[in-house]
A protein has these predicted regions:
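N-terminal capping/lid subdomain adjacent to the active-site entrance of alpha/beta enzymes
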Residues: 1-161
Length: 165
């Protein structure tokens, strides 16, 4: 299939600062992939590449160059994804796989689930961002009330006294 991938960079702003062991995020750069084909006029596939700065293995200085090459390779291979060449770049592989899957689904919904309809979340891990003790405790309580059975704490360098636990 003849195809074209447009890369659309965006800078997202967190609603509240997100603390990690590597610093505090207030913004995050992402790249949206817009897949089209003259063989299927009007059909699109959207993917997202979003490595976390200082945390993702593919957060590299030349990320945009690698992403552009991966997109050109997909075009050259007529929409066939070269998974082996992208093993070291999981965020790029995810973005391209998602764009391709979305394209061939022929609809804005990747699959019809309560999650994709925005009716429910996926309570796998309730992530608690770093903050002071009271803020983190409040987040824990909210996650437990929301039904999370596994809670992941991002405590980094924060000292938590055993009297608090």
């Amino acid at each position: 299939m003849d195809c074209k991938v447009e890369i659309i960079p965006r800078l997202l702003h967190f609603r509240q600062p997100a603390g990690t062991s590597r610093g505090i995020y207030t913004t995050r750069k992402v790249w949206y992939l817009h897949l089209t084909s003259p063989d299927f006029p009007g059909r699109v596939g959207i993917g997202e590449c979003a490595p976390l700065p200082a945390l993702s293995c593919d957060d590299l200085p030349d990320y945009e160059v690698i992403l552009a090459k991966a997109c050109r390779r997909l075009e050259e291979r007529q929409g066939r994804l070269d998974v082996d060449s992208l093993c070291d770049y999981p965020s790029i592989l995810f973005g391209l796989e998602t764009a391709i899957r979305h394209f061939f689904a022929g609809s804005w919904a990747l699959c019809d689930t309560a999650f994709s309809r925005g009716e429910a979340g996926i309570p796998i891990n309730g992530l608690i961002w770093m903050g002071d003790f009271d803020k983190m405790l409040s987040q824990i309580e909210k996650k437990m009330e929301a039904g999370f059975r596994c809670i992941k704490l991002k405590i980094g360098a924060i000292t938590v006294s055993y009297t608090h636990v």
